Amino acid sequence: MARKILVWLLSFNAGFVDTAGFLGLQGLFTAHVTGNFVTLGAALVFGTQGIIAKLIALPEFLIVIVLVRLIGTALTTRRLPTSRIVLAAEVALLLAFFLLAVEFGPFPDSDSPTALITGFTGVAAMAIQNTIQRVHLAGFPPTTIMTGNTTQAALDAVDLIKGVNRKQGVAIRARLASILSGIFYFALGCAAAAGLYFLFGFWSLAVPVVVGVATLALRAES
């Protein structure tokens, strides 16, 4: 049960950080990094801010994943608690994201050095979360990207409606429940970020830090 709650909290955080980053950094996606291709195109067409930030987000994301993979392998070789250490690194980056955003924001120019550094910390945190999900929570649906989850949920719903055998039905229902809960908490994070950012600006990024600390506590128990 602790691992299931951990996944819910990670889904909430991904939705929150992605939405807050988008609102505060001129349309920069921190979790859904490939979405920056779309917003980059819009920035080029309409001449809006954030071209550099969107252009380098994906390379930054990939570099962090490579580093986390290499460090994680080294930690595992030394029989250290890899997942907890990596998760702690994500929480540290979320804290840095919050502190930098509060200190230097708002960012009328999201391509300024301070905005780029702030955005990078958010992207790096979500890159680590993606790696955690793929390596340490592979049995659960993704926590940061909901397109694939939504597709699988629709396919599972169709299969249940048209009818499957008992064994398949049990497996499909369990998977569908897991997927829908992830989508729900991601959407809840998005909604919470929108409301709290409207009220408190970048101070709202304290929420993912608190949630991140909770995930650390849960990971220690599981």
Please provide the spans of the model-predicted regions.
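Alpha-helical transmembrane segments of multi-pass membrane proteins
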Residues: 1-222
